[in-house]
């Protein structure tokens, strides 16, 4: 007995299989997920190119928490490069604050030193690997006389810890801060007023008369 298969004109077997695949909800979900992953990859790729174009610094060892440019206005981000003279001028208006509580913020430090004068910038130093605060900070004031007022805050209590406040030093490249110069005492091994390896001028003094017999103690 022969079996007939009736087919409608214009309908191919391949077309029917494709239509069934499109109607499969699981296949639709997989395709939608793949499309979302591709869009996410393109978005991340675009963000990576944007970071390279603006030159984001990868070093978090010195993190500028807050920079107060004007009254009530704060900006975040790395400071702009400064010349040597500008750094000297800023250091003369800045103080070092040690033993700072790790949970202390720039706002906390500003409130603690607000009586000393107007503050331009507060920098909290962080570890370059972990990003955690190192426990000290620098505060830049608008006026030099504010440094003297801030030094009087030495050994005050900040967030339960006694802090250390000192004027900020200017580190000059190639010059050691421990080299104070000046006289350092008599050099070792000095035998006369001539350097090692040089013979004294003239004949050495040997006394008068003939030498007597040598008396050995033993």
UniProtKB/Swiss-Prot annotation:
Residues 93-170 form the RRM domain. One of its GO terms (molecular function) is identical protein binding. One of its GO terms (cellular component) is cytoplasm. This is Embryonic polyadenylate-binding protein 2-A. GO terms for biological process: nuclear-transcribed mRNA catabolic process, deadenylation-dependent decay. The gene is Pabpn1l-a. The keyword Cytoplasm applies. SMART domains: RRM. Its main location: cytoplasm. Residues 1-26, 169-218 are annotated as: Disordered. It is found in: Cytoplasm.
């Amino acid at each position: 007995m022969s079996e007939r298969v009736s087919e409608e004109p214009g309908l191919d077997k391949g077309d029917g299989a494709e239509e069934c695949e499109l109607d499969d909800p699981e296949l639709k979900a997989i395709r939608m997920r793949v499309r979302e992953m591709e869009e996410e990859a393109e978005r991340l790729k675009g963000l990576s190119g944007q970071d390279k174009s603006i030159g984001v610094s990868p070093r978090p060892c010195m993190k500028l928490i807050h920079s107060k440019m004007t009254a009530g206005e704060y900006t975040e981000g790395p400071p702009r490069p400064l010349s040597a003279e500008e750094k000297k001028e800023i250091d003369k208006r800045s103080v070092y604050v040690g033993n700072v509580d790790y949970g202390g913020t720039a706002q906390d430090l500003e409130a603690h030193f607000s009586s000393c004068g107007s503050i331009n910038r507060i920098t909290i130093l962080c570890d370059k690997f972990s990003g955690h605060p190192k426990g000290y900070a620098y505060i830049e004031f608008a006026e030099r006389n504010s440094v003297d007022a801030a030094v009087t805050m030495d050994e005050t209590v900040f967030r339960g810890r006694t802090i250390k406040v000192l004027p900020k030093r200017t580190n000059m490249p190639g010059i050691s801060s421990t080299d104070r110069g000046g006289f350092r005492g008599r050099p070792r091994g000095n035998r006369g007023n001539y350097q090692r390896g040089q013979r004294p001028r003239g004949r050495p003094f040997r006394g008068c008369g003939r030498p007597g017999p040598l008396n050995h103690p033993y």
